[in-house]
Regions:
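Thiamine diphosphate
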Residues: 67-221
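Glycine-rich, acidic loop regions that bind phosphate or pyrophosphate groups
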Residues: 1-15, 120, 145
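Active-site diphosphate/adenylate-binding microenvironment
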Residues: 13-98
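Extended, charge-rich low-complexity interaction segments
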Residues: 6-28, 110, 159-168, 174-175
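Acidic/proline-rich low-complexity IDRs
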Residues: 11, 21, 25, 36-37, ...
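Solvent-exposed, charged interface segments at domain starts and junctions
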Residues: 1-2, 47, 64, 119-123
Length: 221
């Protein structure tokens, strides 16, 4: 039906402006958080002609924290039947028509479909960068309302912890491997070679990530 009023639009704009200012402040304060790493990754990915986002947190993070100064028009995403399945396959399919393609997926997503990298030799030449957020077993279910108040036995059911590195996966399929733990480590992305295949493992600081999440969740803006 008809809507009589939309409320105080100017107030909503002011609130959004304050929230964005808080987000920018937190990204500077917590440079090793997942959110800040996504921002930095997006700055480098902006020079690509296509970007592929894995399901779940990568899409949410990109929507909230990716850079917006350089428009990125060709952004693709896909949700498998179980969410995480087929994501790397989807990225490789999208990259087949791109000269410089970037992807950002979670660790469980990458492990689930890592064998898709066997397709690399079948693809045309091009620069491909696969970013993997390794936070030790996913983390979206930690952000659910009420999750913080659950007993430890219940919280263990919300994640799938692991201690795996993605270096061996990169080596298995002939990819260059880079590890990023700090903001300075992103400088490695300045030296990407043309027609190279690179796996970038992002290892964020959990405390900084949680600090940003809680500050934004409790912000009175």
């Amino acid at each position: 039906g008809d809507i009589d009023t939309v409320g105080d639009v100017n107030g909503l704009r002011a609130m959004n402006k304050r929230r964005k200012a808080l987000m920018e402040e937190l990204l500077i304060t917590c440079p090793e958080s997942e959110q800040a790493m996504v921002r930095s990754f997006s700055c480098f990915a902006a020079d690509g002609d296509c970007i592929y986002l894995g399901n779940s947190m990568p899409v949410r993070y990109w929507n909230s924290f990716a850079q917006t100064s350089i428009p990125t028009e060709n952004v693709r995403a896909n949700r498998g039947a179980n969410g995480i399945d087929g994501q790397i396959s989807g990225f490789l399919g999208v990259s087949a028509r791109c000269s410089r393609s970037w992807a950002l997926v979670g660790d469980l997503t990458a492990m689930y479909d890592s064998n898709a990298l066997a397709l690399l030799p079948q693809l045309d030449r091009g620069t491909r960068v696969l970013g993997v957020i390794n936070n030790g077993g996913g983390g979206i279910f930690r952000t659910l309302p009420g999750a913080d108040g659950q007993p430890e036995t219940m919280r263990k059911l919300l994640v799938q912890p692991h201690a795996h590195s993605f270096k061996a996966i990169a080596e298995q399929w002939g990819m260059r491997y880079l590890t990023i733990r700090t903001a300075e480590d992103f400088d490695q992305l300045d030296s990407l070679e043309e027609n190279s295949q690179t796996l970038v493992e992002l290892i964020p600081d959990r405390e900084q990530t949680e600090q940003i999440r809680l500050r934004l969740a409790n912000a009175q803006v």
